[in-house]
Amino acid sequence: MSDWNPSLYLHFAAERSRPAVELLARVPLENIEYIADLGCGPGNSTALLHQRWPAARITGIDSSPAMIAEARSALPDCLFVEADIRNWQPEQALDLIFANASLQWLPDHYELFPHLVSLLSPLGVLAVQMPDNWLEPTHVLMREVAWEQNYPDRGREPLAGVHAYYDILSEAGCEVDIWRTTYYHQMPSHQAIIDWVTATGLRPWLQDLTESEQQHFLTRYHQMLEEQYPLQENGQILLAFPRLFIVARRTE
């Protein structure tokens, strides 16, 4: 896959950071020493962690060289490592693992989540936020356009679901706080929706297409978005964006 584009990702920085702020507010920890920010991106979530725990040793993990470079430039006091979340091993047990909009990209959560819990110190916390928009028009239409144009399905799998995550983490020895929130983002145009998803969910669909194929895909996608997302009275578009939140704390 081509590398992530930090500038495009940060075009909606306020909207992307808001769930991280709300997830962080539910983390029941005070004085802690070791934190990992999994899928740290350009460092916007890491900055929130550093602001709350300025004395902690924070390590940001991301597989994108471009994102890691951006994060290092923005936060020289934090450590950033280019690595796969599934394979990275901390040097010590972690008091907090923070994963904002990253774990949805990885498969087999039935193994991944217990593995992450095993990296925590006693009473440590795994805090996770994942987009839960597999059934939203933005993502359904990606699959429909690909089917129409005879391209393979490259979208991510749907999340396991609230009850499944509760059971996974309870069985891993955690107290679990889990909730789901739907945000309604004001978009000035249908093209703005495309700009949003091009930085994230649409990337796998476009990565192997030629420039002309990408344009053909996006033109059709734009047409279908217009059918699914009507304009409000003031000309804005409300983009529904559900997100799943989990705060799991080890009980020993």
Swiss-Prot record:
Xref: Pfam families: Methyltransf_25
Reactions this protein catalyses: trans-aconitate + S-adenosyl-L-methionine = (E)-3-(methoxycarbonyl)pent-2-enedioate + S-adenosyl-L-homocysteine
Gene3D superfamilies: S-adenosyl-L-methionine-dependent methyltransferases, Vaccinia Virus protein VP39
Subcellular location per the Swiss-Prot or TrEMBL entry: Cytoplasm
Family: Belongs to the methyltransferase superfamily. Tam family.
NCBIfam families the UniProt entry points to: PRK01683.1
Function: Catalyzes the S-adenosylmethionine monomethyl esterification of trans-aconitate.
Protein name, as recorded: Trans-aconitate 2-methyltransferase
Encoding gene (name): tam
